[in-house]
Amino acid sequence: MKIADLMTLLDHHVPFRTAESWDNVGLLIGDEDVEVTGVLTALDCTLEVVNEAIEKGYNTIISHHPLIFKGVTSLKANGYGLIIRKLIQHDINLIAMHTNLDVNPHGVNMMLAKAMGLKNISIINNQQDVYYKVQTYIPKDNVGPFKDKLSENGLAQEGNYEYCFFESEGRGQFKPVGEANPTIGQIDKIEYVDEVKIEFMIDACQKSWAEQLIKQYHPYETPVFDFIEIKQTSLYGLGVMAEVDNQMTLEDFAANIKSKLNIPSVRFVGESNQKIKRIAIIGGSGIGYEYQAVQQGADVFVTGDIKHHDALDAKIHGVNLIDINHYSEYVMKEGLKTLLMNWFNTEKINIDVEASTINTDPFEYI
């Protein structure tokens, strides 16, 4: 399996297009044409993680947090530059799966909920997928070659199906005037043409490409085409809603999380003895969604990186919070390893996958 094949597999199961627009996911460092010798999953790509991959003989690291995020202005032999230089020197490929793994139904938030021992887990804050139905009109004799060109360039595909078009016949008319250079017809004379209306679906990201291809391969000098926007609720969403088997107090639930996740500290906002049943979870930094979670029926909102003033606002408004620290997302190391092994087994791919043993939490606790 080459890196390009691995990227295709990852994109199939955890589409990179579902990442937030501000995010930096995908192949950050590497060569798509090299063979994968082994995969190391990690929360962060630190120098220690790179050394671990080198020791194992693995040439691919898949990290949750992007190493290259805000931009790199120099590659010196220290700091982030040292990490990047070492990756390049040892021909190690670095792939980031950040918010696309956050919003995935099998992703970080699902992994956290399962690690906490919760049940009835479902995605919340579902994304809206945007598609376009494309319509254009073309002379009957040109239909086949035109569809072939669109299909060859990746359009009119639905899942595992290609060449997905709908056709309906009709009669078009036009009159070339002025300096027109018509493929069919004469200047100042109305022309009637047997035409076929061709329809097909595209993803939002294909819109400009579709327009370019239609203009390039349509026989008319000025082709007519429409893009009709269609929105559908996605399977992807930022956060999960889950339940405990039996009601417990907020304090007991916080203590239970600390034990289940094996993390050094947990903070909570709310009345210690308040009963908890439904839990909303957004790993990492999820503040901003706590009130929406309550409106959706959550008794407590679990996330990390909660600031003082956000906690105070929540306390004043009677919203229960539990801060499990950003590093709690480390559960994705084993979680992603399991997913990769399942995907590889299904495809009969024999590549070693290991979860990094390096603790990349920058904090020390007393």
Curated annotation (Swiss-Prot):
Q: Which InterPro entries match?
A: DUF34/NIF3 (IPR002678), DUF34/NIF3_bac (IPR017221), DUF34/NIF3_sf (IPR036069), N-reg_PII/ATP_PRibTrfase_C (IPR015867)
Top-level division of the source organism's lineage: Bacteria
| One Pfam family named in its UniProt record | DUF34_NIF3
The residues that hold Zn(2+) 1 are 64, 102, 329
Q: Does the keyword Metal-binding apply?
A: yes
| Residue sites binding Zn(2+) 2 per the record | 65, 326, 329
Which GO molecular function entries does the Swiss-Prot or TrEMBL record give? metal ion binding
The UniProt keywords, alphabetically, are: Metal-binding, Zinc
Single GO cellular component term: cytoplasm
The similarity comment for this entry is: Belongs to the GTP cyclohydrolase I type 2/NIF3 family.
**Assembly:** Homohexamer.
Q: Which PANTHER family match?
A: GTP CYCLOHYDROLASE 1 TYPE 2 HOMOLOG, NGG1 INTERACTING FACTOR 3
Q: What is this protein called?
A: GTP cyclohydrolase 1 type 2 homolog
Highest classification ranks of the organism: Bacteria, Bacillati, Bacillota, Bacilli, Bacillales
